A protein has these predicted regions:
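Extracellular beta-rich repeat passengers
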Residues: 117, 343-413
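Short strand-connecting beta-turns/loops that link adjacent beta-strands
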Residues: 7-10, 63, 98, 193-195, ...
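Right-handed parallel beta-helix
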Residues: 102-113, 151, 171-185, 194-209, ...
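Structured core elements
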Residues: 15, 68-69, 189, 211, ...
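Short, solvent-exposed linear motifs at loop/edge-of-secondary-structure regions
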Residues: 1-8, 63, 311-327
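Extracellular beta-strand/beta-solenoid scaffold signature
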Residues: 85-93, 122-126, 131-132, 151-166, ...
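Extracellular polysaccharide-degrading/modifying enzymes targeting complex plant/algal/animal polysaccharides
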Residues: 1-169, 174-177, 220-231
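Active-site lining segments that contact anionic ligands and/or coordinate catalytic metals
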Residues: 55, 64, 257, 280, ...
Length: 413
């Protein structure tokens, strides 16, 4: 949220509201400014009448309580249908650890038109995957951790964005052939303490935030670099099956969001999905920036098709992992067609596959990518990389993505 703009010659001094201003400028990487190595940190300004210059854009004058809209070609405002969402969550399925909600199936239901007001009211400083910082500090000099982990240059505490459909403390809550469209934040969120659940044949389209979230991304009072391994294993999201879904036009407002983001999860299977037109990575698996063993294990990302990704953000990959995840696999996926936006922090910091800090005991095998641009950053032990790149059997490329019975999702208007 902008507090003031003061023009100074050919420049302008922009000041932001608190607390987000302090939190953002404490953020260690990428720094929100031009750095000494010449890397850029761009700012994207919205909601000013002067910026209303492209058809389809709008401006909300909050003082006058008036909305200005620049019509697209052929649109007539006298005949326009306008949707102004007023609710953040449409459906909430919530039990307790001792009395979970069980065996509910949603089939052929459309979930549409939600909002999310927190960024307008309190600001929004995202860390990653749409998780926003409620507080954060830079650490100088860096804090030494145990021998397994790199020194720590920051600490952060996170909040979780709203979702159109929330599932908490439940078992086997399924979504078959549903549509999640025109949403102001996350589409579907298996938030905490959920066992089982199938998401199959669903369309996720035109969503401001993440398409689908699974599992904890650090509880609110838990510093985000600490491993999460609750004594009561019922708190962990496990055994979700996400397959044959189509994700497109995700993260339209919050550019650090993904089609599918799974945090501290176990036995999760993500396969035969197609992902396109996303601002950042396609699939993110894991959390924590630590090699320390935690509750994550036995996860599988298999035969997904990811293309036309990274529309706005770098430090990115088609498939991205974090943290120690014994017996986890990234196999037979197809990744191609990355965008090349001109304003990213570092124009070379993009990849097809990316195992980030603490990634351990993960097998990355037989993935078709149009080049061999990968990153293994501050990884732990036990990772296996075998047979990835453009020379992988073309059958892998052909099999990736939606299976025959679900290709109709690509043609839904």
């Amino acid at each position: 949220r902008i507090r003031s703009i003061e023009v100074q010659g050919d420049s302008a001094a922009v000041r932001f509201h608190q607390p987000e201003s302090r939190i953002q400028f404490e953020h260690p990487w990428p720094r929100p400014m031009v750095t000494t190595d010449g890397h850029n940190s761009a700012f994207y300004l919205t909601n000013a009448r002067e910026l209303l210059d492209v058809p389809g854009e709008w401006y909300h004058d909050m003082n006058a309580r008036r909305v200005y809209y620049y019509p697209r070609e052929g649109e007539k405002m006298q005949e326009a249908e306008v949707m102004a969402p007023a609710i953040e969550t449409l459906v909430q399925v919530e039990g307790t650890l001792d009395r979970p909600v069980c065996h509910i199936r949603f089939e052929k239901i459309t979930f549409s038109y939600t909002t999310w007001m927190r960024p307008s009211e309190k600001g929004h400083v995202p860390l990653q995957a749409g998780m926003y910082l409620t507080d954060g500090y830079r650490i100088d000099p860096k804090m030494q951790r145990n021998y397994l982990n790199h020194p720590l240059d920051n600490q952060g505490w996170l909040g979780r964005p709203a979702a159109a459909v929330r599932v908490v403390a439940a078992r086997q809550i399924d979504f078959e052939r549903c549509r999640f469209e025109h949403l102001g934040s996350t589409g579907l969120d298996y938030e905490e303490a959920v066992q089982g659940g199938v998401v199959r044949g669903c369309l996720f389209r035109d969503i401001a935030g993440n398409g689908l979230l699974v599992g904890s991304f650090s509880p609110a009072a838990h510093e985000t670099h600490l491993p999460y391994d609750p004594a009561d294993r019922r708190e962990v999201c496990t055994q979700q099956q996400i397959n044959n879904c189509y994700f497109t036009e995700i993260g339209n407002e919050d550019w650090g969001c993904l089609a599918i983001a799974a945090g501290y999860v176990g036995d999760v299977n993500i396969e035969h999905n197609e992902i396109s037109e996303v601002p950042y990575s396609g699939i993110s698996l894991g959390w924590g920036w630590t090699q320390t063993v935690n509750c994550m294990r036995n996860n599988r990302v298999h035969a997904n098709l990811i293309h036309h990704y990274a529309k706005h953000m770098y430090d990115v990959a088609g498939i991205y992992t974090l943290g120690s995840q014994p017996k986890s696999y990234v196999t037979e996926n197809c990744v191609h067609s990355i965008y090349k936006p001109g304003y990213v922090h570092d124009p070379n910091h993009w990849f097809y596959l990316y195992t980030d800090e603490g990634s351990s005991f993960i097998t990355v095998r037989d993935n078709w990518t149009e080049g061999e641009k990968y990153l293994q950053n501050a990884n732990g032990p036990g990772n296996v990389w075998e047979n990835n790149g453009p020379k992988v059997d073309n059958d892998v490329r052909e099999r990736a993505g939606l299976e025959a019975g679900y290709k109709d999702l690509l043609n839904i208007q």
